[in-house]
Amino acid sequence: MKLFSASVFAAIIASHYASATAHIRAPNVKPRRTNSLLTAPPQQPPLPSAQQAASASSSAGLNLTDIQGDILIGMKKNKELFFFFSITDAATFKAKLGSDILELITSTNQLLAVATQPITAVNVAFSSTGLKALGITDDLKDPVFEAGMLSNAVSDLSDPGTGNWVPGFVGTSVHGVFLLASDTIDNVNTELANIQTILNGSITEIHRLQGEARPGDQQGHEHFGFMDGISNPAVDGFTPPAEIRPGQALIPPGIMLLGEANDTFQNDRPPWAKDGSFLVFRQMQQRAPEFNKFLQDHALNMPNMTSEQGADLLGARIVGRWKSDAPIDLTPLVDDPVLAADNQRNNNFDFSDATNQTRCPFSAHIRKANPRGDLGGINKFPNQHIIRAGIPYGPEVTDAEKASNSSSTDPSLERGLAFVAYQSNIQNGFVFLQKNWVDNTNFFRPGTGVDPLIGTNSRNSGTDAPNTPRVVSGLDPNNATSTIEIGIDFVVSRGGEYFFSPSLSAIRTVLSV
């Protein structure tokens, strides 16, 4: 464990136990906005107002001025850049982090009101090797984070090796990531240039990924066409009880934030880590043309349905929701956009009456990733909840790709999801979901198969041999025992890393000292 001087140690303790007002920074004199930088798809649970969050956090003892803004806000950005970097001059980086970068970091409290939102929101997170580069060797009690994603990508995440990974993610050179979000890419690029100027050559760019909400009525939808982020849990101390939507899980803050109530290692983490969160990043390429072709080729044959409607039904059963976001557990054969837009109803289901798969297949993506009533209810497995905060990247499918039913090999046309998930324990959160539920052929019933949407062929046979078609059951409502063989991965991992998103006070008193 790193030894600090007496003065530094005193500063850490003083900051940790200081009142909430001690963390409130002087107002930033930079221009403020008149319209929100956050998106608000009606299907997703709304954010609390600043006043509501202040009341909820006060009763739970959360300090929203000290928690980085992306952690609890979730998937509500229009443009977001992920800038991955390596620290080449630790002394300069630490000095600039404390003197200049810290005032740019956006807190949760700042994001909740337009009047306090910056033109571009900025968050920062560090890998295990990044913390070590800053001289931080304290044990955060998360061995998955400590080892890095490269160590468990094959064994736990079902990546068939790193052949498809972005080169920058192969190795330990990624020390950190800046997350920059705004309503225009120009704003994002301006703030990035400002950060690079401030850091004065103390970092080197490893990789960058520009995320962007899809246009028009596809805002909030990923590239397969389905709405994302509907099932994010409510966090006690952030979401007021009156704003919790039917079917939405309520979890203790320690499931997301280190050192808070119900954190598995609440009393074992270093004090400065309180109110930080582990950020899982995965660049997930989506083969949208191939997915759509698969639906066309295997369209379900249902009475009074056209082939196109049968393809839409198959897609809905693979995902567990229609493209409008209406859940098939509530409307199993026809889409219901009115239901989808009603956030009082669109998440209010639990699979508990569906034992024959006529409504929702056991293998459906949303059932694999969030089994709800299959395991006793949404609040019966709180440790397995994560907050997803990702965003699509890449252009819309081109006419040429539609015509060929094949994704272009042009790197500029790659599209997918910049997957981001927060939790206080990566093993209990993201890794558990991926390994024990999504990629487990016998969850939650024997013979279910892997997740047909994001599962990979390499794991289906129990080996890591690639190109082994995965077999999924239950997708045909007329014959639950029938199986469909899926010979292509619709989602391809391009790599990623595990990061720690520290509190603002930790940046000030530990990481920049």
From Swiss-Prot:
Entry keyword annotation includes Iron: yes
UniProt cofactor(s): heme b
EC number: 1.11.1.19, 1.11.1.7
Binding residues annotated for heme, in chain numbering: 365
Catalytic activity: Reactive Blue 5 + 2 H2O2 = 2,2'-disulfonyl azobenzene + 3-[(4-amino-6-chloro-1,3,5-triazin-2-yl)amino]benzenesulfonate + phthalate + 2 H2O + 2 H(+); 2 a phenolic donor + H2O2 = 2 a phenolic radical donor + 2 H2O
GO CC annotations, alphabetized: cytosol; extracellular region
Residues passing through the membrane, by range: none
Molecular functions (GO terms): heme binding; lactoperoxidase activity; metal ion binding; peroxidase activity
Annotated region (Disordered), positions in chain: 33-52
Active site: residue positions: 228 (proton acceptor)
Signal sequence extent: 1-20
Domain of life, source organism: Eukaryota
Enzyme class: oxidoreductase
Residues that make up the propeptide removed upon maturation: 21-55
Keywords, comma-separated and alphabetical: Heme, Iron, Metal-binding, Oxidoreductase, Peroxidase, Secreted, Signal
Keyword Electron transport: no
Location relative to the cell: Secreted
Co-factor binding comment: Binds 1 heme b (iron(II)-protoporphyrin IX) group non-covalently per monomer.
Task performed by this protein: Manganese-independent peroxidase that is able to convert a large number of compounds, but its physiological substrate is not known. In addition to classic peroxidase substrates (e.g. 2,6-dimethoxyphenol), oxidizes dyes such as Reactive Blue 5. Also degrades beta-carotene.
Quaternary structure, from the entry: Homodimer.
Family note: Belongs to the DyP-type peroxidase family.
Official protein name in the record: Dye-decolorizing peroxidase msp1
Lineage per the UniProt record: Eukaryota, Fungi, Dikarya, Basidiomycota, Agaricomycotina
